[in-house]
Amino acid sequence: MRNRTLADLDRVVALGGGHGLGRVLSSLSSLGSRLTGIVTTTDNGGSTGRIRRSEGGIAWGDMRNCLNQLITEPSVASAMFEYRFGGNGELSGHNLGNLMLKALDHLSVRPLEAINLIRNLLKVDTHLIPMSEHPVDLMAIDDQGHEVYGEVNIDQLTTPIQELLLTPNVPATREAVHAINEADLIIIGPGSFYTSLMPILLLKEIAQALRRTPAPMVYIGNLGRELSLPAANLKLESKLAIMEQYVGKKVIDAVIVGPKVDVSAVKERIVIQEVLEASDIPYRHDRQLLHNALEKALQALG
């Protein structure tokens, strides 16, 4: 029997936020509705942060970023969704996509309904699910025991992080848990370690689903050095250990990293190490190279 390929899988689930998750989803967009992204919703900076401070609700920025990268048919709707206001007025810096998602959130019973309305408008087949449909922020405790609230402040820390929490304690979106339960393959990364990847793993229902699933899990490492000093100073094996500490079980079966990463301390996991950089932006993954690396990981997993 031949080894499985990505095209053979019925359900692929990717976890993360920011540009990284969007890159993974766009590299696998040929899977269509068999692909699901579970998106971090703790951002409190930029346009997203301004909307949250004035209107409340979940953070829409990472969701918008994923939708932007999944648009394959340019249209008036997609141009509107990607538009960012300039100038010095009250709308300066706001992304229209964030405002559209927030408006649809007001008009919908659930944030997930707002996302599905936008997906249909933009002709995006990939399922996108917020990690939680409740407003939530990230909190860190630094090495001095100080509480640091919000992604923006956590990104500015210069000392090690001792603990991460979500505040308040919120439930995961039930469809996200179901997607993990049904998955044939789970992917996490790339992305900002503490502020894009870890928030999803802090949800107890997500952690429980990851402990229980028989699906293999692949971690994709960043290509560039993180701007956050606590994250930038972590070695690959430390990141894997921290993720699994919060999940409560050894769950990562394979890692995909660039050629410069030290993998000598990574034991009992499949390592796919090769050139992955996009030609235009070296710290971003090339979509085809990433797709090929995921195929190799799947083949090695058997």
Curated annotation (Swiss-Prot):
Gene Ontology BP terms: regulation of cell shape
UniProt xrefs under Gene3D superfamilies: CofD-like domains
Function comment: Required for morphogenesis under gluconeogenic growth conditions.
GO MF annotation: an example: LPPG:FO 2-phospho-L-lactate transferase activity
Gene: ybhK
Organism: Escherichia coli (strain K12)
Keyword Cytoplasm: yes
GO cellular component, one term: cytoplasm
Protein name (database record): Putative gluconeogenesis factor
Assigned protein family: Belongs to the gluconeogenesis factor family.
